[in-house]
């Protein structure tokens, strides 16, 4: 898999979750923040990243930097995905189903952020298992990563698309 250069893309970013973590010390509590950010060009490229810092803006900046390093390519057919798939990460499972045009993005919270920024216009999704935002985002990205176009599968098998689809 070749790396996608984030500098050549018009990337949008969306903060999915901010977590405040407290460390209790003698003088009281010390707070730190962890941010989960999704970036994408709404044209088949998306990535997510985590950032931790003493302040929220710094955590978000680090997360965006991390997300730009982890961009993936999403195969989009028309306005939807090529086939149904279940993305799994930890206890989080996300079911992604192609939908007919005009359906829109039917997805909750973190999954919706990933699909919107990937540029998927019509899709049905259901999150199963863990509803932790990090696990949901990772499961969604993993599912999108495993998608394959009919042409790619046909080429791998040395057949035509017509032979493959019957």
Swiss-Prot record:
Keywords: Ribonucleoprotein, Ribosomal protein, RNA-binding, rRNA-binding. Residues 11-74 form the S5 DRBM domain. SUPFAM superfamilies: dsRNA-binding domain-like, Ribosomal protein S5 domain 2-like. The keyword Ribonucleoprotein applies. Coiled coil: none annotated. GO terms for biological process: translation. GO terms for molecular function: rRNA binding; structural constituent of ribosome. GO terms for cellular component: small ribosomal subunit. Signal peptide: none annotated. InterPro entries: Ribosomal_Su5_D2-typ_SF, Ribosomal_uS5, Ribosomal_uS5_bac-type, Ribosomal_uS5_C, Ribosomal_uS5_N, Ribosomal_uS5_N_CS, Ribsml_uS5_D2-typ_fold_subgr. The N-terminal domain interacts with the head of the 30S subunit; the C-terminal domain interacts with the body and contacts protein S4. The interaction surface between S4 and S5 is involved in control of translational fidelity. With S4 and S12 plays an important role in translational accuracy. Located at the back of the 30S subunit body where it stabilizes the conformation of the head with respect to the body. Belongs to the universal ribosomal protein uS5 family. Part of the 30S ribosomal subunit. Contacts proteins S4 and S8. This is Small ribosomal subunit protein uS5. It comes from Halalkalibacterium halodurans (strain ATCC BAA-125 / DSM 18197 / FERM 7344 / JCM 9153 / C-125).
